[in-house]
Amino acid sequence: MALLTDLHNHSCLSPCGSLDLSPRCLAELAAARGVKVLALTDHNSSLNCPAFAKVCFRLGVIPLFGMEATTAEEIHCLCLFTSLEAGRAFGEYAYSILIPFPNDPEKTGDQVYVDEEDNIEGEVAYFLPNALDLSIEAIGERAAGYGGIVIPAHVDRPAFSMTSQLGVVTAGPWAAVECVRLPPRVFHVPGAADGPAGAGHPDTGYLLDTLGYPLTTSSDAHYPEHVARRPFELDIPAEELQPGGPGTEADMGALKRALGRRPAFRQPDDG
Protein backbone atom coordinates (compact mmCIF):
# COMPACT_ATOMS: atom_id res chain seq x y z
CA MET A 1 0.00 0.00 0.00
CA ALA A 2 1.40 3.41 -0.99
CA LEU A 3 1.36 6.22 1.54
CA LEU A 4 1.01 9.80 0.33
CA THR A 5 4.07 11.57 1.73
CA ASP A 6 5.36 15.13 2.06
CA LEU A 7 8.79 15.65 3.62
CA HIS A 8 9.36 19.40 3.23
CA ASN A 9 7.10 21.85 5.04
CA HIS A 10 7.56 25.01 7.06
CA SER A 11 5.52 26.59 9.84
CA CYS A 12 5.17 29.94 11.58
CA LEU A 13 8.66 29.39 13.01
CA SER A 14 10.27 30.09 9.62
CA PRO A 15 10.40 33.85 8.99
CA CYS A 16 9.47 33.29 5.34
CA GLY A 17 6.39 31.31 6.37
CA SER A 18 2.90 32.51 7.17
CA LEU A 19 1.92 33.03 10.79
CA ASP A 20 -1.27 31.20 9.85
CA LEU A 21 0.68 28.02 9.09
CA SER A 22 1.03 26.69 12.62
CA PRO A 23 2.02 23.06 13.21
CA ARG A 24 -1.64 22.33 13.90
CA CYS A 25 -2.75 24.01 10.67
CA LEU A 26 -0.12 22.13 8.67
CA ALA A 27 -1.07 18.73 10.06
CA GLU A 28 -4.81 19.30 9.79
CA LEU A 29 -4.66 20.52 6.20
CA ALA A 30 -2.31 17.73 5.14
CA ALA A 31 -4.53 15.09 6.73
CA ALA A 32 -7.62 16.54 5.05
CA ARG A 33 -5.80 16.39 1.71
CA GLY A 34 -4.84 12.74 2.11
CA VAL A 35 -1.23 12.96 3.30
CA LYS A 36 -0.29 10.03 5.54
CA VAL A 37 3.42 10.73 6.20
CA LEU A 38 4.32 14.34 6.99
CA ALA A 39 7.52 16.13 7.99
CA LEU A 40 7.98 19.53 9.59
CA THR A 41 11.20 21.13 8.37
CA ASP A 42 11.57 24.74 9.45
CA HIS A 43 14.80 26.57 8.72
CA ASN A 44 17.55 25.31 11.04
CA SER A 45 15.17 24.65 13.94
CA SER A 46 12.88 21.94 15.27
CA LEU A 47 11.21 24.01 18.00
CA ASN A 48 7.73 23.51 16.56
CA CYS A 49 8.12 19.73 16.31
CA PRO A 50 6.67 18.90 19.77
CA ALA A 51 3.37 20.61 18.93
CA PHE A 52 3.45 19.05 15.47
CA ALA A 53 3.89 15.56 16.96
CA LYS A 54 0.87 15.92 19.23
CA VAL A 55 -1.42 17.01 16.41
CA CYS A 56 -0.18 14.36 13.98
CA PHE A 57 -0.68 11.58 16.51
CA ARG A 58 -4.19 12.84 17.20
CA LEU A 59 -5.02 12.85 13.48
CA GLY A 60 -3.44 9.51 12.64
CA VAL A 61 -0.72 11.08 10.48
CA ILE A 62 2.78 9.55 10.72
CA PRO A 63 5.10 12.44 11.67
CA LEU A 64 8.76 12.99 10.86
CA PHE A 65 10.79 15.66 12.60
CA GLY A 66 13.70 17.82 11.58
CA MET A 67 14.62 20.91 9.64
CA GLU A 68 15.71 22.42 6.38
CA ALA A 69 19.35 23.03 7.22
CA THR A 70 21.48 25.60 5.42
CA THR A 71 25.05 24.41 4.97
CA ALA A 72 28.13 26.62 4.95
CA GLU A 73 27.87 26.66 1.15
CA GLU A 74 24.26 27.89 1.48
CA ILE A 75 22.82 24.61 0.22
CA HIS A 76 19.47 23.59 1.67
CA CYS A 77 19.19 20.02 2.96
CA LEU A 78 16.38 18.22 4.74
CA CYS A 79 17.55 16.60 7.97
CA LEU A 80 14.87 14.13 9.06
CA PHE A 81 14.36 12.03 12.17
CA THR A 82 11.74 9.52 13.19
CA SER A 83 12.42 10.29 16.86
CA LEU A 84 11.10 13.55 18.25
CA GLU A 85 13.84 13.67 20.85
CA ALA A 86 16.53 13.14 18.22
CA GLY A 87 15.02 15.88 16.09
CA ARG A 88 14.94 18.26 19.02
CA ALA A 89 18.54 17.44 19.97
CA PHE A 90 19.76 18.02 16.42
CA GLY A 91 17.85 21.30 16.40
CA GLU A 92 19.68 22.44 19.52
CA TYR A 93 22.99 21.48 17.92
CA ALA A 94 22.14 23.35 14.72
CA TYR A 95 21.24 26.53 16.61
CA SER A 96 24.58 26.36 18.41
CA ILE A 97 26.44 26.61 15.08
CA LEU A 98 24.10 29.09 13.38
CA ILE A 99 25.54 32.46 12.34
CA PRO A 100 24.42 34.65 15.28
CA PHE A 101 22.75 37.43 13.32
CA PRO A 102 19.74 38.95 15.13
CA ASN A 103 16.37 38.60 13.46
CA ASP A 104 14.37 41.76 12.76
CA PRO A 105 10.72 40.67 12.56
CA GLU A 106 9.64 43.89 10.84
CA LYS A 107 12.11 43.31 8.00
CA THR A 108 12.48 39.53 7.73
CA GLY A 109 9.43 38.07 9.46
CA ASP A 110 8.40 36.55 12.76
CA GLN A 111 10.01 33.38 14.14
CA VAL A 112 7.55 32.05 16.71
CA TYR A 113 7.18 28.60 18.19
CA VAL A 114 3.80 27.52 19.51
CA ASP A 115 1.95 24.76 21.32
CA GLU A 116 -0.55 22.36 19.76
CA GLU A 117 -3.35 24.93 20.20
CA ASP A 118 -1.42 27.71 18.41
CA ASN A 119 -0.54 29.59 21.60
CA ILE A 120 2.79 31.37 21.18
CA GLU A 121 5.44 30.03 23.55
CA GLY A 122 8.38 32.12 22.41
CA GLU A 123 10.32 33.73 19.58
CA VAL A 124 13.77 32.84 18.24
CA ALA A 125 16.36 35.61 18.46
CA TYR A 126 18.76 34.74 15.62
CA PHE A 127 17.76 34.78 11.95
CA LEU A 128 17.09 31.11 11.27
CA PRO A 129 17.72 30.83 7.50
CA ASN A 130 21.37 31.84 7.93
CA ALA A 131 24.08 29.29 7.22
CA LEU A 132 25.33 26.77 9.74
CA ASP A 133 29.02 26.24 10.39
CA LEU A 134 28.71 22.84 8.72
CA SER A 135 29.70 21.86 5.19
CA ILE A 136 27.69 19.77 2.76
CA GLU A 137 30.28 17.03 3.21
CA ALA A 138 29.77 16.99 6.98
CA ILE A 139 26.02 17.31 7.30
CA GLY A 140 25.18 13.72 6.41
CA GLU A 141 27.59 12.40 9.00
CA ARG A 142 26.32 14.78 11.68
CA ALA A 143 22.67 13.95 11.08
CA ALA A 144 23.43 10.23 11.05
CA GLY A 145 25.08 10.65 14.43
CA TYR A 146 21.69 11.72 15.78
CA GLY A 147 19.93 8.84 14.01
CA GLY A 148 18.70 10.87 11.05
CA ILE A 149 18.90 11.04 7.28
CA VAL A 150 19.67 13.86 4.85
CA ILE A 151 17.95 14.71 1.56
CA PRO A 152 19.42 17.58 -0.51
CA ALA A 153 16.51 19.94 -1.14
CA HIS A 154 15.09 21.25 -4.44
CA VAL A 155 18.24 20.43 -6.40
CA ASP A 156 16.65 21.78 -9.59
CA ARG A 157 16.08 25.30 -8.22
CA PRO A 158 18.28 28.30 -9.10
CA ALA A 159 18.98 29.25 -5.47
CA PHE A 160 20.07 27.48 -2.28
CA SER A 161 20.50 24.16 -4.08
CA MET A 162 23.38 21.89 -4.98
CA THR A 163 23.20 22.98 -8.60
CA SER A 164 23.03 26.70 -7.84
CA GLN A 165 25.97 26.54 -5.44
CA LEU A 166 28.11 23.72 -6.85
CA GLY A 167 26.83 23.27 -10.41
CA VAL A 168 26.05 19.56 -9.98
CA VAL A 169 24.53 17.06 -7.59
CA THR A 170 27.40 15.67 -5.56
CA ALA A 171 27.75 12.23 -4.03
CA GLY A 172 27.14 11.78 -0.32
CA PRO A 173 25.21 9.73 2.21
CA TRP A 174 21.89 10.97 0.88
CA ALA A 175 18.75 8.94 1.50
CA ALA A 176 17.19 10.58 -1.57
CA VAL A 177 17.34 13.76 -3.62
CA GLU A 178 14.44 16.22 -3.68
CA CYS A 179 13.29 17.84 -6.91
CA VAL A 180 10.61 20.39 -7.60
CA ARG A 181 9.53 18.46 -10.69
CA LEU A 182 10.21 15.08 -12.23
CA PRO A 183 12.24 14.48 -14.29
CA PRO A 184 14.60 17.07 -12.78
CA ARG A 185 15.64 19.83 -15.16
CA VAL A 186 17.68 22.95 -14.48
CA PHE A 187 17.74 26.24 -16.35
CA HIS A 188 20.51 28.03 -14.47
CA VAL A 189 23.63 26.14 -15.57
CA PRO A 190 25.56 26.25 -18.89
CA GLY A 191 23.57 24.51 -21.62
CA ALA A 192 20.25 24.90 -19.85
CA ALA A 193 18.80 27.07 -22.60
CA ASP A 194 19.62 24.54 -25.32
CA GLY A 195 16.55 22.34 -24.94
CA PRO A 196 14.90 21.23 -28.20
CA ALA A 197 11.47 22.69 -27.49
CA GLY A 198 12.42 26.34 -27.10
CA ALA A 199 12.60 28.74 -24.18
CA GLY A 200 9.80 28.44 -21.67
CA HIS A 201 8.71 24.97 -22.75
CA PRO A 202 8.58 22.37 -19.93
CA ASP A 203 11.03 20.18 -21.87
CA THR A 204 13.56 22.98 -22.22
CA GLY A 205 16.48 22.82 -19.86
CA TYR A 206 19.29 20.56 -18.87
CA LEU A 207 18.23 17.12 -17.66
CA LEU A 208 19.95 16.92 -14.30
CA ASP A 209 22.09 13.94 -13.36
CA THR A 210 20.99 12.98 -9.85
CA LEU A 211 23.54 10.15 -9.65
CA GLY A 212 21.00 7.38 -9.26
CA TYR A 213 19.68 8.57 -5.91
CA PRO A 214 15.99 7.95 -5.19
CA LEU A 215 13.94 11.00 -6.14
CA THR A 216 11.23 12.75 -4.17
CA THR A 217 9.09 15.83 -4.65
CA SER A 218 7.70 18.06 -1.92
CA SER A 219 5.34 20.93 -1.25
CA ASP A 220 7.90 23.16 0.49
CA ALA A 221 4.83 24.71 2.08
CA HIS A 222 5.14 28.22 3.51
CA TYR A 223 1.44 29.12 3.40
CA PRO A 224 -1.72 27.09 4.04
CA GLU A 225 -2.53 26.99 0.34
CA HIS A 226 0.82 25.29 -0.34
CA VAL A 227 0.09 22.26 1.84
CA ALA A 228 0.01 18.97 -0.09
CA ARG A 229 0.60 20.62 -3.46
CA ARG A 230 3.46 18.27 -4.47
CA PRO A 231 3.43 15.09 -2.36
CA PHE A 232 4.79 11.73 -3.50
CA GLU A 233 4.03 8.09 -2.74
CA LEU A 234 6.04 5.83 -0.43
CA ASP A 235 5.66 2.17 -1.29
CA ILE A 236 5.21 0.79 2.22
CA PRO A 237 2.30 -0.32 4.41
CA ALA A 238 1.55 1.93 7.36
CA GLU A 239 2.02 -0.95 9.80
CA GLU A 240 5.58 -1.49 8.52
CA LEU A 241 6.55 2.18 8.70
CA GLN A 242 4.83 2.59 12.07
CA PRO A 243 5.23 -0.86 13.70
CA GLY A 244 4.05 0.39 17.09
CA GLY A 245 0.71 1.34 15.63
CA PRO A 246 -1.07 4.71 15.43
CA GLY A 247 0.24 7.34 17.80
CA THR A 248 3.81 6.00 17.80
CA GLU A 249 6.98 7.10 16.07
CA ALA A 250 8.00 5.73 12.68
CA ASP A 251 10.80 3.21 12.16
CA MET A 252 13.89 4.72 10.52
CA GLY A 253 14.98 1.48 8.89
CA ALA A 254 11.59 1.09 7.26
CA LEU A 255 11.67 4.70 6.07
CA LYS A 256 15.08 4.20 4.45
CA ARG A 257 13.91 1.04 2.69
CA ALA A 258 10.81 2.77 1.39
CA LEU A 259 12.78 5.76 0.10
CA GLY A 260 15.16 3.34 -1.59
CA ARG A 261 12.27 2.05 -3.69
CA ARG A 262 11.56 5.49 -5.16
CA PRO A 263 12.32 6.07 -8.87
CA ALA A 264 15.89 7.11 -9.68
CA PHE A 265 17.62 8.67 -12.66
CA ARG A 266 21.17 8.85 -13.93
CA GLN A 267 22.52 10.38 -17.12
CA PRO A 268 23.94 7.73 -19.48
CA ASP A 269 27.70 7.59 -19.84
CA ASP A 270 28.63 9.16 -23.16
CA GLY A 271 31.78 7.09 -23.18
What do the PLM-derived regions correspond to, one by one?
Residues 111-145:
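Alpha-helix-centered segments that form part of catalytic cores
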Residues 1-7, 13-35, 46-92, 128, ...:
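Charged catalytic cores and adjacent phosphate/nucleic-acid-binding surfaces used
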Residues 30-39, 101-110, 128-136, 160:
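Short low-complexity stretches enriched in small and charged residues
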Residues 82-124:
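Active-site gating loops and adjacent loop-to-helix segments of metal-dependent hydrolytic enzymes
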Residues 11, 39-41:
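Ser/Thr-glycine-rich phosphate-binding loops at phosphate-binding pockets of nucleotides
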